[in-house]
Design a protein with these regions (language model features):
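Juxta-kinase regulatory segment immediately upstream of eukaryotic protein kinase catalytic domains
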Residues: 100-106
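An alpha-helical support segment within catalytic cores of ATP-dependent transferases
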Residues: 209-259, 263-270
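Amphipathic alpha-helical interaction surfaces in cytosolic regulatory modules
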Residues: 22-93
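ATP-binding pocket architecture of kinase catalytic cores
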Residues: 109-215, 251
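Catalytic activation segment of kinase domains across protein kinase-like and atypical kinase folds
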Residues: 267-290
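Active-site activation/catalytic loop segments of kinase-like enzymes and analogous catalytic loops
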Residues: 290-331, 346-362
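ATP/Mg2+ or Mg2+-diphosphate-binding catalytic cores
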Residues: 349-386
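Short beta-strand/loop segment at the start of cytosolic alpha/beta domains
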Residues: 1-15
Length: 386
């Protein structure tokens, strides 16, 4: 039995890989810590069988959640597991999440392809973002929730519809009328690179002034810390300690942060920029976004720019230089100082976290962090303590 845990604030998703029976139930019960949770989701996508011992484990977790005023939800039950839930009456006790709608993208226009997924145009009014194989459906459900929160805050984001599946992949459908990918617009008119960069800088500045709803949005620093703690098989205790130390040094904030803000997650609709990817929308320091943008466009040796945006590396570097100039032009000087002291650490965070949830990129990201970014982070740490 393999157990995957994803904690987002007071919501935790526990994904079971294997049978939940007398052999595995004790470990599952230990791992399903309910303290401080408002919602505990148990995902049965890869769990083909549950025994009476497994049922008792689920009931124990349900009682704990109920006693603290929380909710336990079971989702993605196979027909065999659903039958067991029905026969035992468990389906009348435990909340069951509805099954996502199945779609096909055969013949659909591919708008963009990146590290996490692909965007397809379904029709003149809607697009779907499909996550890569191996990315859990909870990511799509989370994105829908955060997209709605951003829309309410007035952040220019596409209207989200429903969570869907396409074969073994999951995704989310958005409304977008006659829109073009921002990366495509940049590739078409690279001579306007400074103008394009200023548009992203203005969008980022606007997003970073919005106050986040703590009832809906998680604290990004807490999420990052949780991911780092799961990297014991990839990095040494000293390296993990260093990453956590650098994370704690980044100031807290009560404003919004996107954590995947780049030109292939933005569409141009009627001349306005509209964000289409809100899966990591959170509350936290704007430095997390600036580090992500720097990683994609300003660190050419990583090769992320062409992978994520199809913009050539040299153009990406010019884009970063212009973005940096425009973004920090109207920010407090201390923000620029924080970024300069932590730029390599901040640039490493996105791919460091992705080691946990993007299995198809795991080896590459570990190598890039270890060989390229960690030595620079260590140098930053020595500089800050000097």
């Amino acid at each position: 039995m393999q157990i995957t845990i994803d904690t987002q604030g007071d919501r935790r998703t526990v994904t079971l890989h294997g049978n939940l029976d007398a052999t595995t139930a004790p470990e599952v019960e230990v791992r399903m810590d309910t303290a401080g949770l408002r919602e505990l989701v148990i995902d049965f996508t890869d769990c083909p069988f549950i025994s009476s011992a497994g049922i008792r484990t689920i009931l124990v977790a349900h009682r704990r959640m109920a006693a603290s005023g929380g909710t336990l939800v079971a989702r993605n039950l196979s027909p065999a597991v659903r039958e067991i839930f029905d026969l035992t009456g468990l389906s009348k006790v435990i909340a069951l999440a509805k099954t996502a709608r199945e779609i096909s993208v055969d013949g659909c226009e591919l708008l963009s392809s990146g590290v996490c997924g692909e965007c397809f145009r379904l029709d003149d009014e809607t697009v779907v973002k499909l996550y890569k194989d191996g990315v859990h459906i909870s990511m799509a459900e989370q994105e829908k929730t955060y997209a709605k929160a951003a829309f309410v805050l007035g952040i220019p984001t596409a209207i989200s519809y429903d969570v869907v599946t396409c074969g073994t992949r999951s995704g989310i459908v958005f409304e977008l009328l006659n829109a073009e990918l921002f990366s495509a617009a940049i590739r078409r008119d690279p001579q306007l690179i400074d103008t394009h960069a200023k548009r992203l800088a203005d969008l980022a500045a606007s997003l970073h002034t919005a106050k986040g709803d703590a009832e809906v949005l998680p604290q990004l620093k807490d999420r990052i810390r949780d991911y780092i703690h799961q990297l014991g098989d990839a990095f040494s205790p000293a390296e993990i300690s260093l990453l956590l130390e650098r994370l704690d040094a980044i100031p807290d904030a009560d404003t919004c942060v996107h954590f995947d803000l780049h030109t292939s997650n933005i569409m141009v609709q009627d001349g306005e920029l509209v964000i289409i990817d809100m899966g990591d929308f959170s509350i936290g320091s704007n430095m997390f976004d600036i580090g992500l943008i720097y990683m994609i466009y300003g660190v050419p040796e990583l090769g992320i720019c062409e992978l994520a945006t199809k913009i050539d590396t040299a153009t990406g570097v010019e884009f970063w230089k212009s973005f940096e100039k425009h973004y920090f032009a109207h920010r407090p000087p201390e923000e620029r100082a924080i970024f300069e002291a932590n730029r390599h650490f901040l640039s490493a965070l996105r791919i460091t976290c992705a080691i946990v949830y993007l299995p198809h990129m795991r080896d590459q990201f570990i190598r890039q962090v270890r060989e390229i970014l960690l030595p620079r982070i260590q140098a930053e740490s020595r500089g800050s303590s000097a």
